[in-house]
Structure formats: structure tokens, C-alpha cells
Amino acid sequence: MKKKIYEGKILGLSVYDLVIEGRKVKREMIEHRGAAAILAFDENNKLILVKQHRYPHGYVIEIPAGTLEKKEEPKKCAFRELEEETGYSAKKMTPLITYYPSIGYNTEAIHCFVASGLKKITDLKLDEDEILSVIKMDFKKVISMIKNGKIQDSKTICAVLTYAFKKRLN
């Protein structure tokens, strides 16, 4: 049985009464449609990142990303968010990894993609509450910033390290 406690623009909160292996349990669950995140390299092989204000943490450096619209496919969201946040279009989005940032109490899945065939086409198309700027960095510098704790965003860490790991194995 599910009891909806709250429904907002981005997330909801429900309490579930479940039976797991014959035992009655309660689970509080933050419900989120999920997100798409994008690793995109420009024509000079620099990783395109955004410096974005994320309350309550202040400004963070992260890969472009955004929440799925209702019934939107993750790949479509990735194309849309890349263009909105960076002004770049991509010819192709290749799935990299899907992961659950808070699996015990949150339904959110983050779908990470690698964009290719990039072309600068427009200025940023930010949502009214987004405060960000585009920055470009060498991939090795991004790895160094992760190692030094300067990049702390989980989707960025997961996507960058997965990409580096897969490249190293190939």
C-alpha cells in the first residue's frame, strides 16, 4: 500500500507498507522521474562542464544534466539538456552507465551518455531557476579534481571514472 505524502515539481514523497519475505515493513521513498547526464568533448577534446549554483552547496562543477520530463526517454533528455545547458547539439548519444545515487530511499536513476558529433548551435536556454556557466577542461584535469575532492558531484564522478575505466580497458 502506498500513501502519497507530498508531490512537488521535481520529486514526491510516499510511504509504502510492504511485505518482504513474509515481514511487514514500512519504507519512506523519495520519488523522482530520473535524469540524464552527458559527457561531451569539444573540437579540442576538452570536456564540456557547467559551473552551476546548487543550493545549499553553492557553485559546483559538473557535467551537463537534467531531470526527465514526464514520459521522456533518457536519450531524448540528454540531447535536450546538452543543448539547453551548453548550446551544443550532438549527432549521437551513446549510453555509458545508469546508476542509482541513493538506492535505499530514492527512485532516481541517472542515465549517463557520451555525446559525439558536437556542433555549437545556440546560446544557453536555461530554465528560469538555473544559474550556470559553461567551462571546458582537459579530461586529466577533471580526473585530478575528482582525486583532490574539488569535484564532488556524484553523476560527474560516476560518468568520468566509468569513461576513464572503459577507455583504459579498451
Language-model features, listed with the residues they occupy:
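The catalytic Nudix box helix
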Residues: 62-95, 113, 127-130, 138
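Acidic, metal-coordinating catalytic segment for phosphate/diphosphate chemistry
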Residues: 2-37, 42-43
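Conserved Nudix-box catalytic region and its N-terminal flanking loop in Nudix hydrolases
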Residues: 36-80
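Acidic pyrophosphate-coordinating catalytic loop
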Residues: 4-6, 99-111, 168
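Short, well-ordered beta-strand micro-motif
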Residues: 15-17, 40, 114-116, 136-138, ...
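Strongly charged, low-complexity linkers/loops
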Residues: 107-145
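Active-site-adjacent beta-strand/loop module that shapes the phosphate/pyrophosphate-binding cleft
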Residues: 12-14, 18-22, 102-121
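Nudix hydrolase/Nudix homology domain
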Residues: 2, 22, 70, 129-170
